[in-house]
């Protein structure tokens, strides 16, 4: 078995006039959390998008369980078990909470979507997050913190989750929601899931919640 779950070696990515990533190295062991801290414009978002297949690196290599991977797009990364919670919710406001949570992981009953299974599954995940949001609620009607919890729930609904990247996930959460989030993070680590926790220098999580930075 490979020592590292995810590795980046010499990754570079540039945009016109800007070198966003310069020889980035990352070694992520199973069941560990790494804090990636930096100011705005330091390349944190580009880093996420390279790992999740949104951007393609110009140089360097990425390995998953010791095998080289070359994601052609976000779907490839998702199928490999890599998920991301972004700073600003990317949920669909015109869809319900349940529809958002099961987006890309829809359950079917015959030729039709199984709305009952979606509703029950959404309730179960939201209870784990200590949120009693009705699954039929439109996401656009929720406050920003609740939308972020729906985003987290959608990623937790990924059965083959291996690596979770969290981009300033607490920025729109209440103190109580942050406490729940850190509890969930510890549960994920115990299950062997690896986490990359991205934050600004002055909003870094407690040292006890991260193992490397």
Predicted regions and their residues:
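Helix-to-loop junction immediately C-terminal to a conserved catalytic motif
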Residues: 52
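Single conserved hydrophobic/aromatic residue that forms the stacking wall/gate
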Residues: 202, 207-213
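Catalytic Walker B motif of ABC-type/P-loop ATPase nucleotide-binding domains
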Residues: 164-168
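Short coil-to-helix "N-cap" segments within the ABC nucleotide-binding domain's helical subdomain
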Residues: 2, 70-75, 107-128, 132-136, ...
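Conserved ABC transporter NBD signature motif
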Residues: 60-71, 76-80
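The feature captures the beta-strand-to-loop junction immediately N-terminal to the Walker
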Residues: 37-39
């Amino acid at each position: 078995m490979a020592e590292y779950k995810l590795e980046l070696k010499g990754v570079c990515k540039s945009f016109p006039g800007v070198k966003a990533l310069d020889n980035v190295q990352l070694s992520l062991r199973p069941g560990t959390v790494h804090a990636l801290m930096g100011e705005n414009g330091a390349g944190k978002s580009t880093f996420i998008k390279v790992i999740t297949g949104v951007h393609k690196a110009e140089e360097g290599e990425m390995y998953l369980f010791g095998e080289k991977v070359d994601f052609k797009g976000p779907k490839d990364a998702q199928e490999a078990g890599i998920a991301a919670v972004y700073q600003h919710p990317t949920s669909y406001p015109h869809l319900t909470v349940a529809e958002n949570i099961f987006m890309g992981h829809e359950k079917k009953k015959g030729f039709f979507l199984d709305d009952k299974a979606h509703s029950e599954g959404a309730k179960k995940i939201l209870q784990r997050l200590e949120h009693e949001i009705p699954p039929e609620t439109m996401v656009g009607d929720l406050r920003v913190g609740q939308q972020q919890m729906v985003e987290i729930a959608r990623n937790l609904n990924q059965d083959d989750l291996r690596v979770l990247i969290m981009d300033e996930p607490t920025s729109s959460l209440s103190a109580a929601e942050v406490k729940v989030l850190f509890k969930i993070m510890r549960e994920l680590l115990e299950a062997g899931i690896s986490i990359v926790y991205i934050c600004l220098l002055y909003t870094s999580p407690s040292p006890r919640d991260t193992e490397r930075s």
